[in-house]
Structure formats: C-alpha cells, structure tokens
C-alpha cells in the first residue's frame, strides 16, 4: 500500500512537471502550439498589384555590396530622426558586429522625413556612417507600416541575396551571435558551409554554391494570439472599423514588431500580397495579416523578447535571450560591456551550471520579479 501511494505521488509530481514545462514560464508550450498554425491557414491569396511606396531620399544602394558574400543576416532598425543617441549606442554595441559565427551581418537604420532643422544633421550622419535608409514620408508612429514596407522593398531591390532579415526597433538589444546560431539551426547553411570559413578561397566557393538555393520560408518572432483591435480614438494603437470590421474578429497571429525575422523568401511573399491587405497603421499586425494572406504562419520563439524588458544579466543577455526591449542608450552599452571583453571582443558569456540548466526560464523569472 505505501508503495502504491508513493507511485501515485510520483505520477502526480511528474504530471505537474510536464504541465509546468509545457504551459509555464518556459514558453515551450507556446512554441509547440505555434507549430499548428500552418494547418489553419486559408488558401494563399493571389498576388496583388505592385505597392506604391514613397521614394527613397537616402537609398544607400551599395550597402550590401563588396567582394565578399552577401549578408547572412540583415538587421533593419526602425528609428526616429531625433533618436541619434539610440543609433550611436547601437553602433557602439551590437550594431558594430560585422561577422557572427563566420557569417556576414549588416545593420541599417530606417527612418522617414525629419523636421527641416534636422535635415543637415541627418545628411552628415548618413555620410559618416553609411547605414541610413530614408524614405519620403513624415516620420511618425502611425507611419510604421510605410517605414517597414519601404525597408523590405529596399531589401528585395538592393539586397535580395541576404538570407534572413531581422526587423527591430532602436530600443531593443540584439544578441547577434546567438541569433545567427538560432537561424543556422532553423534552416541556415549546411555544416560544410559553416566550416568553410577556414580558407578564404573555400569560403567563397561554398557561398557561390549556395547562392542560388532557395531559403526556406520563415517568419519567426514572439507571437501574439487573438489580439482584438483597439477602438479608443486617443490610443496610438487605434484601428477603425473601416480598416478592420468587428465581424472579422481578432487579428490573425502575428509576431511582435520589437523583433521578428523573415527569410528573404518570406519578404518577397509579403511584398507580393501586401497591396491586398487592409492598410493597418500597426506594422507588426499588417505584416502578420499579409503573411497569412500569402499562406505563411508565424513561428513562436520564446527567446525573442516581444514587449518584455529584461534586467541586465550577463547570462541572459549573452546566452539565452535573442532580444530585450525597452533598453535605453546607457543600458545598451552596459549590456554590451557585460558580454564583451575589455578590448571589445565578445567572450563566451558566463553562466553557472544552475543558470545554464534553468536557461530562458530563469531570465523570464528575473523579468517578472523586476516588473
């Protein structure tokens, strides 16, 4: 009888562990659930007419050029003209990375038209850094969809050989090396390509070999589920019934605009169907709606922060998180110091065995306790 009771207690504990693992703060259940989204997609819509997008004032058309391979990861940072401190903090931290895990990384800043007195400053900044993409629309939160589409269209026109594009914001810290590793695991280059960096000639040959290969469709981010439009006119997230009628129900699942990854094939698919989607001012929702119309569902990744801010922590920022939101310029550079050596070279992040065992779960608890 005591043995039978012991077995019952053991089974109950195991059941609680399974439930906690799947549906608790680890986020594993969310990732597994997102895999079912593809089976719920409607038939893809037919391509729409070409998008009518604002012209580029600063095109930086040769940003992806050079004698080496094209970017494995191209990062588009949405920023405002007056956010110079944020851009400089990124340039001095994770945005300075040009290679991760042996692959080229490129970071560019997206913005619209500034106030007249900022025009000269922006031109000087662009000439100095050559990392600015500017389109001819008034820069505002309600124009984020225009800004993002202008960036994706630039990628398709000037950098179609990039494999993956991360769209993010200027208050987000990005763990570039771990993000590249994540993308390699999810469908990046072959192991042979990864190891080919040992000799320049071999690297070039292998990149050429993979140049014509199609990149698998990927739309990766912190997925929001069953979000309904905000009808409050004063809210910057306001969506009118004309744009999204009530009988349409909630928005389809979409990835948080603070940081999502699109493969180049996903970028091209979204651009083909975007003109048939309602012109929503919420850029991340618009991308999700367009992706759904194209037959593409988002994949949930718990390592991407979404709207969550994580306190500075060497193990979380260096190993387990791919992004952290609401990071000001000072915190951006402090986070960089945590995961970098004294000479600016990135060192292996320090995690104790317990920190490593708890992984992302520990980081989420830290964020929860500090909120």
Swiss-Prot record:
Family of this protein: Belongs to the glycosyltransferase 31 family.
Gene name, Swiss-Prot/TrEMBL: B3galt4
Record's function text: Involved in GM1/GD1B/GA1 ganglioside biosynthesis.
Residues carrying a glycan: 143
Alphabetized UniProt keyword annotations: Glycoprotein, Glycosyltransferase, Golgi apparatus, Lipid metabolism, Membrane, Signal-anchor, Transferase, Transmembrane, Transmembrane helix
Outcome, altering residue 248 to R: In strain: pgn2
Transmembrane segments: 5-25
Catalytic activity entry: a ganglioside GM2 (d18:1(4E)) + UDP-alpha-D-galactose = a ganglioside GM1 (d18:1(4E)) + UDP + H(+); a ganglioside GM2 + UDP-alpha-D-galactose = a ganglioside GM1 + UDP + H(+); a ganglioside GD2 (d18:1(4E)) + UDP-alpha-D-galactose = a ganglioside GD1b (d18:1(4E)) + UDP + H(+); a ganglioside GA2 (d18:1(4E)) + UDP-alpha-D-galactose = a ganglioside GA1 (d18:1(4E)) + UDP + H(+)
GO CC terms, sorted: Golgi membrane
Any Pfam family: Galactosyl_T
Enzymatic class: transferase
Documented EC number(s): 2.4.1.62
Lineage of origin: Eukaryota, Metazoa, Chordata, Craniata, Vertebrata
Membrane topology: Single-pass type II membrane protein
Pathway this chain belongs to: Protein modification; protein glycosylation
Entry protein name: Beta-1,3-galactosyltransferase 4
Entry's Gene Ontology BP terms: ganglioside biosynthetic process; protein glycosylation
Organism for this UniProt entry: Mus musculus
Chief localisation class: Golgi
